[in-house]
Curated annotation (Swiss-Prot):
HAMAP family hit by this protein: Trp_synth_beta
Function: The beta subunit is responsible for the synthesis of L-tryptophan from indole and L-serine.
Stretches that traverse the bilayer: none
UniProt organism field: Lacticaseibacillus casei (strain BL23)
NCBIfam families, per database record: trpB (TIGR00263)
Name of the gene: trpB
Key words, A-Z: Amino-acid biosynthesis, Aromatic amino acid biosynthesis, Lyase, Pyridoxal phosphate, Tryptophan biosynthesis
Protein name: Tryptophan synthase beta chain
Amino acid sequence: MKTLNETTQQSTRAGRYGKDFGGQYIPETLMTELEKVTKAFNDLKDNPEFKAELNDLLVNYANRPSLLYYAKNMTEDLGGAKIYLKREDLNHTGAHKINNVIGQALLAKHLGKKRLIAETGAGQHGVATATIAALMGMDCEIFMGKEDTDRQKLNVYRMELLGAKVHPVTSGSMVLKDAVNATLQEWASRSDDTFYVLGSAVGPAPFPEMVKHFQSVISTESKQQLQAKETRLPDMVVACVGGGSNAIGSFAAYIDDPSVQLVGVEAAGKGVDTDRTAATIERGSVGIFHGMKSLFMQNEDGQIDPVYSISAGLDYPGVGPEHAALAQEGRAQYVGITDDEAVEAFTYIAKQEGIVAAIESCHAIAYVEKIAPQMAKDQIIICTLSGRGDKDVASIAKYKGVDVDE
């Protein structure tokens, strides 16, 4: 039996980024289903009725548009560039994940699917998928690495509360990559009534394009909002990167504006030069995994190496193919932030702005703390807060040696 990581099918130029990233590297058993998903997405994405249905849910259910908030205290404290925060933490379910899930769930409904499955790391994508499944009357099953179910017990209970069945994945390193493996295997075995709501801009085509399409609402809004506030484009857009959905959504509307610097912030863990890191773009090499060609943390034999981050949402051993291409082309810059720096930023933004941000987002905030003082006061940074940090309070307290009752 062929595994999900064997190259049994290759795409044409469709679904490719840069020189050769992306594509479809999947078993024959999934090719027909992927073709159906691709056709449905291409047929519906510009369909007026589908767009109206999507927009109605984004506005009246997900609470969009999200705020573009001027971080006055941070700006004054850091003494450099003007800082705006794109507040995806204020969306229904508390993160950017809902944008993509609504779009994919509508697609699933149009395909006649009755059951949604998804992987999740920090739990936010799982919560969003369970939420929309409840709204649309669909069955839902979530696959989550055992390490992550232990780290994110509150989100596990939230998913179950919403009616989802959560499967702790005990294979491999028991983290996000293993949850993706398990979900792909489940989809391959039962695609007739099931739709895989992939949470990040990864996987075989059309998933990276589809996730970007649904997440691009972040930058479409921020571009319009900043134009209304400042009548100009930002000088820099900053977002954290695991697989890369929030970052590609934050970058999308600016990619064709070379005056806007794009910065993706990866999880350096204990340090980029250690073996306890998830800084894929800085440390990874080209390979094939999870149905795509991209950059991965892997050994000389092409076996995926374990990765580490304090953040369950950023410890993925690869990155979306468009991010790999943007890095290769020099259009975007990717930097690493350590656990210690992210934890410091968690406290910093809370005390400066009264915002408890997700530890994933705090990797981006930590970079803003470094770069803003080096910029002129008439320059502007937009930093995306991908989610809220309620889920992280207990683990951050533990990291700091503070005993709290979860």
